[in-house]
Amino acid sequence: MLFRSVIHVASRVVSKQALSLLCEHSDVMATRQTGWAIMSSHCVQEAHDLALVAHLSAITTSIPFLHFFDGWRISHEVNSINRIPCEEVAKIYPYEAANDFRKRALNPNHPYQRGIAQSQDIYMQNCVVAQPFYDAAPDKVQAAMDKVASITGRQYHLFDYTGAKDADRVIVVMGAGTTVEETVNYLNKQGEKVGVVKVHLFRPFSRKHFDAAIPKTCKSICVLDRCREDGAPGEPLYLDVVATMNQLKRNATIVGGQIGLGGKDFTPAMVKACFDNLNKPEPKNRFVIGVNDDVCHTSLPYGAPLPTLPEDVKQCIFWGYGSDGTVGSTHDAVKLIVKNTDFNAQAYSVYDAHKSGGLTVSHVRVGKEPIRSEYLVQQADYVACHNSTYARKFHMVNQLKEGGIFVLNSPWNTIEELEKNLPNHLKRDLANKKAQFYNIDATAVAQSVGLKQRINMIMQNVFFTLCPIIPGGRAPKLLEADVSARFGSKGKEVVEMNLNALKQSLANLHKIDVPASWATLGDDAPRVWPEGTPEFLKTLYPALYSEGDTLPVSKFVVGGVQPAGTSKYEKRGIATVIPVWDAEKCTQCNQCATLCTHVCIRPFLLDAEEVKKAPATFKSVPAVGDELKGLNFRIQVSAMDCSSCEVCAVNCPTNALTMTNFREVGERESKNWEYAMTLTNKGKIGRASCRERV
C-alpha cells in the first residue's frame, strides 16, 4: 500500500473476555499486515517529536505511517516537554516531495484509477513490486530522525540503545521503554551490566539497524510485548526479534514476556525481575509479570519498589472522587509549577468505571530533570485523601514514605474524633511511618462559601502550603490569579466563591499529633457479609477497594463470567449530603425515583403490619389511589448509594426533599433503607389507581 498518510493512535485493548478502555498494543498489532509503517513512542516528549518524524517519513517514503503511544498512560498524561516551534519545522519540511504528493491526487484533469480488481495471474506481481519502497524506508526514517535532531538536539534512532556498552543482558521493548531505561541506569550503578533497546520503527523491521543496536557482548535478550496472542508460539515483537537474530546468525538466549495487559502497571521492580530471569540457567519463556499466575505458573515474582528516581523528585498522590475537581486541580498545579519554577512535572490520573462520584487517584511528580517514569507513584512524599469515606475503604498510606505528609479531608478535627472514626490499619500505618498528619474539613469550607462539593482550590492551597515547591511565598498570589483565569467566564460570583475558599482554607487546617499508641493497634474487625452474598463477591471483593492487583489468576472464571446484580453489595458511601423526605409536603408523584440515575431513592408501600414493625424513624403516610386503600407510602433513599447529585431535590415540585449533611442522618437513613428492603412486593399497580411513576 503506497499512499502518504499518517494517523496517531493512543493504543488500547482489543477487548476479549471483558471491555477495557486502557492501554495495550493489541489494536496496533492487528494492523501488521496492512502495509502501514508502525512507529512507537515511549513517553510524552517522544510522542511530540516522533509525530513530526512520522509525517516527514510518510512524505519521503511514500508509505503510510501509524504512529502510536500508550493509550491512557501517555495520551492522558500531563508532562512538561520542549515543543518544536513551527518556524523550525519549516526549515526541514520537504516541500518538493509534498508538492509531488499533491500532484498524485485524483483529479479530472489528469485522471487515473485506484482500487481496481486484479485476477490471479497478475495480483501477486503487483504485491511484490512495492518491496523496494519498504526496503528503502528504514534509512529514510533515520534521515527524518536526524533532521528533527538538527532542530531539537534530541537524537532518535530506529532502535535506541541505553545501558552498559558491554551489557550481557538486554531488554527489547515498545511503549514502556523509558521505565526500563530508568531501571537500567539504576541497576548499572549497582554494578550490573544490562541494557535496553527501545523500538521506534516496528514496521518495516530493519535487521541492519537492530543488529547495530544490540551490543556484541549480549548473551541473553528479553523481549517484552504489551499484548497477548493466545495460541501463538510468541507475541509479535518477540517473534520478530527471534527471526531477526536467526537471520543475523547471532547466538543469544531469547525469551519473551507479556507486560501491562489492560493497563496493568509496569514498574522498575518488574523490570529487575525480567533481568533476574535472564540470569537463570534456563530462563522462563513466554512469562507474564504483574500478576500471580497460580494456574499455569507462567508469572515472574518481583520485589519491593526500587528507588530509581533522583532524590530531589517529589512524588504525591491525591485520592479524590469524580466531580470534586481533584483531577483538574492536579493538572493545574503541574502547569503552575512548570510555568513559575525551573522544575519539570508530571501528572497522571487513574479512574474507576463510575462517573460522578467515582474514585480518582492522581499521581504527581516534580523534579529538576525531565520525568519519564511511566508508572504510578510508589513512594510518595505527600498523600492527600479528599473524601473521608475512603479512610475505611482504601489503604492510602501504603505508598507514603517514612516521615511523609498525609492530609485528610474530614469533619474530625480532634484526636478523639479521629480515634473513633479512623480504622486501625490507617492509624497504625501513620504511627509506624512517623507521618506528618493534617486534617481539614474542606467540604464544610466549600459548602460555607457556596461551592458545594468542589473542594479542589481548597486542597490545592493546602498542597502548596505543605509542599512549598513554588518558592518565595508566591503560591497564594498565583492561585488567586489562576482562579480569576479559570473561572472568569463563569461570572464574578463563582470567582468570589473560589477566592473565599482559598482565604478560609488554611484557617481550617489542623496539625494532628499522632499518638505513639497507634503504632501497636491490632487489626480491624473482619468483614461481615450479609446473608445471601454470592461466593464470587466474597472472593473478588478486593477489586472494589482498589486492591485487585493482589488477586491471583485462580480466583477468576474463564470468559469473564460473573453473577448478575452484584452492584447492590458495593455501597460506596460517597455522599456528603443526602435527600431527607418530608411526608407532609410530598404529593406522591414519584418524580424523584424516576429521575434518580443511581436508582437509590425509591417509593415504598407498606401494609398495616409493616407499618407497626417499622422503626420509629420510618414514617409513612396513607397512599394516594383507590387501589391502594389500606396501604401506606414512603420515599426512602439508600444513603450508601447516593452520590449527592441533588437531581431529586432540585426537581421535586413541592420541595419535599431536603439535602441534609450525611454525617447527621446517614446512619439513620441506612437503617431505614435496610427495613425498606424487607417490605413485601405489593404486586402490579394499575396506572389509573395511583400516581404514575413514568
Regions found by a protein language model. Name each.
Residues L19-G71, Y95-E96, A243, Q247-G260, ...:
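Conserved thiamine diphosphate
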Residues P204-K208, T217-S220, L224-E235, L239, ...:
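Active-site cofactor/cluster-binding pocket
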